[in-house]
């Protein structure tokens, strides 16, 4: 059996959650000796896609009657792998599937999602294809703390003081930047801590309220766009806190990597899958911005205990080998029953 693992965005988009998911899938298949290709026009027995932008590419395996798997809702921070639209209507966040995402998913032989709540969300939004739950694997070796050279990259790249604590936040640049106050208010009270906000730069980042937020933030808040993988990984290895201040669903890939890097997770409830994280056990989870700010400050002041050990133990069970075997079981089932 041979598998097509397909995700080929423009170079501008090929350095975020989609690229890391592709690397994870390929790594899992390599660990168990499963052959794969990235060439859409090669010969293969099953095709694995992960982006709504590739809807038109499904024509090739469909014409060949090759089973198609689509991984969905794992990389929602990445525009190239984002399946959802988020709109604020009357003060309430409305989440819907992108039209092209719905078309893609309903052409699939099988859809893979990371949690039961993700499955329910797809069904509520009109997905009729079979859906299975599988949590992506993590290459724990990429977050090995013995690699001092990798830890040093962050300090060389940003010229930071090694004695300062680091808070890393993941989000997006939107017109209103909902939730960003939880990060900024924490930074205002801890000038001795450096706060980094990482997100994919959009048109909104240069205009309106988003630009005002960035300009008015304290000097210890640094707004950055997506970084090269080695720099981002080094940042994770040095971060004391990984924060999700926004309301939109975040990418499970980024959350898993923060767990593997032993960062303390402080996240908004709506930004994560409830099945992955448990409040006060593997993360600190809150609904409102004031509580997120307080949790961040309390952790930095050692007033609340870390949940990093339990989070690392949980993420360790999602290793590449197990992920590879689960994928191959699904691939074989589709090939056998086509």
What kind of region is each of these model predictions?
Residues 264-267:
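Short hydrophobic beta-strand element within catalytic cores of glycosyltransferases
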